[in-house]
């Protein structure tokens, strides 16, 4: 068995584009994946690659466990703050609370500045390949993505809550126990006991669609079960070979939020969140036909399910030049648990104190729940398309130790939604194997939801290909 099995262990990657290579650490540090990845790591990228030999041709099986990648990008926060808040979110810890002045600064920093986060976890992957049969693989992968961008008003309301300038009047509790209405003056509010402020009131309220103009909140968490097959279709000596592959995927949905507005009364806004998040929707829950409060003891209870397909085709020329094309995530998910549509109502007042720190994940209830900005109508279900992408890539082998290539990834959704890219991605990179047991990777990437980056990676190949372990970064600069 040792000579026929490749096992991938102890895998991790940092600052990565999760959807580019899913949780495959061996592809993370390269900047390109469409024609590079093999075995189960090709799932979700290009199923035609399953027709190729495994990386070590004498192996017939490949298996991997506990592979993960994550990325965070923000124009408003330092890299250290991003790392600290991400670690707090993973550990389900609450960070230190803002002072009033820190809230004011946070609102300024996040105005028009995007925040993107991706986390991908591959719990298990398996692949089998022979020349006669081709290649078949199965993989379980969790994909979590967050993207947000706020205009000035929304940024102030989210961080300052009832003291945001939009609310021009404040109801305060006096020492005598009486209440009084005062003007919301920043210089005066900073000196008040914040606990004495009951709520903020807008005397000239706006509809949420207008107030949210140009802002976006997108969240997606899905668990993907992917079964794919690929093989060689045509071969003409060592000059030309054609490969094709197909994959079918079953999705479980844990969370979905899509809130956008163009300011002209056209607002796309709905959410479906597992009961594990503990969001209180107030009175809207009682009338919601999809209300679900059941809690599972271990994993979050899913609130959506659907199917998708991947298609891929490769051309191999002279056993050196690879050209690949793939279309991934053709399908949809139907969300049928805790489904809510946001009503376009006037925003009169709020009792919210605003976000207490940058750990947004731990405060989703404050944003989406009954104390947040939104009012809801319950829905029985809603079906949304998967974030379909078209991938094109090519690579060339220079001897047995060097392979160089590029990738182009094009989102096809007309309007970017949860789990999708804001713009196309272009990447260049390659692998160098100076020693039989060491592989170095590097590249250059731009586009998607991130700035230009320089990925690097280091992989150790042990036991003549029986084991791989490594680490990679999507951006060596940050």
Report each predicted region and the residues it spans:
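Bacterial Sec-dependent N-terminal signal peptides
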Residues: 1-23, 394
């Amino acid at each position: 068995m040792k000579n026929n099995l490749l096992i991938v262990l102890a895998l991790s990657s940092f600052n990565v584009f999760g959807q580019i290579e899913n949780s495959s650490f061996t592809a993370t540090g390269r900047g390109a994946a469409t024609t590079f990845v093999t075995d189960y790591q090709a799932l979700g990228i290009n199923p035609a690659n399953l027709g190729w030999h495994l990386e070590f041709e004498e192996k017939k099986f490949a298996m991997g466990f506990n592979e993960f990648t994550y990325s965070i990008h923000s124009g408003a926060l330092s890299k250290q703050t991003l790392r600290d808040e991400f670690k707090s979110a993973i550990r389900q810890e609450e960070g230190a609370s803002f002072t009033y002045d820190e809230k004011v600064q946070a609102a300024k920093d996040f105005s028009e500045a995007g925040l993107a986060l991706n986390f991908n976890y591959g719990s298990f992957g398996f692949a089998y390949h022979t020349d006669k049969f081709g290649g078949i693989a199965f993989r379980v992968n969790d994909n979590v993505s967050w993207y947000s961008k706020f205009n000035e008003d929304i940024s102030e309301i989210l961080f300052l809550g009832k003291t945001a300038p939009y609310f021009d009047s404040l109801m305060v509790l006096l020492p005598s126990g009486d209440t009084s209405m005062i003007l919301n003056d920043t210089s005066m509010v900073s000196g008040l006991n914040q606990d004495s402020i009951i709520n903020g009131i807008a005397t000239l309220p706006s509809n949420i669609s207008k107030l949210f103009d140009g802002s976006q909140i997108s969240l997606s968490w899905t668990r993907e079960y992917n079964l794919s097959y690929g093989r060689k279709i045509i071969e003409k000596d060592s000059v030309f070979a054609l490969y094709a592959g197909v994959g079918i995927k079953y999705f479980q949905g844990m969370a979905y939020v899509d809130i956008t507005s163009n300011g002209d009364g056209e607002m796309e806004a709905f959410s479906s969140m597992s009961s594990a998040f503990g969001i209180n929707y107030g009175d809207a829950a009682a009338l919601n036909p999809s209300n679900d409060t059941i809690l599972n003891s271990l994993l979050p209870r899913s609130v959506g399910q659907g199917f998708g397909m991947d298609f891929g085709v490769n051309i191999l020329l002279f056993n050196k030049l690879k050209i690949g094309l793939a279309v991934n995530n053709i399908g949809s998910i139907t969300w049928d648990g805790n489904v809510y549509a946001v009503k376009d109502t006037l925003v009169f007042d709020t009792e919210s104190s605003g976000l207490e720190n940058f750990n947004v994940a731990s405060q989703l209830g404050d944003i989406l729940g009954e104390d947040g900005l939104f009012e809801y109508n319950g829905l029985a279900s809603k079906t949304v398309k998967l974030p379909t992408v078209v991938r094109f890539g090519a690579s060339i082998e220079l001897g047995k130790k060097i392979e160089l290539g590029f990738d182009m990834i094009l989102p096809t959704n007309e309007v970017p939604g949860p789990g999708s890219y804001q713009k196309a991605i272009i990447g260049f990179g390659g692998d160098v194997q100076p020693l039989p047991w060491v592989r170095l990777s590097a590249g250059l990437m731009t586009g998607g939801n991130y700035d230009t980056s320089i990925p690097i990676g280091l992989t150790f190949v042990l036991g003549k290909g029986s084991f791989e372990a490594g680490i990679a970064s999507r951006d060596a600069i940050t």
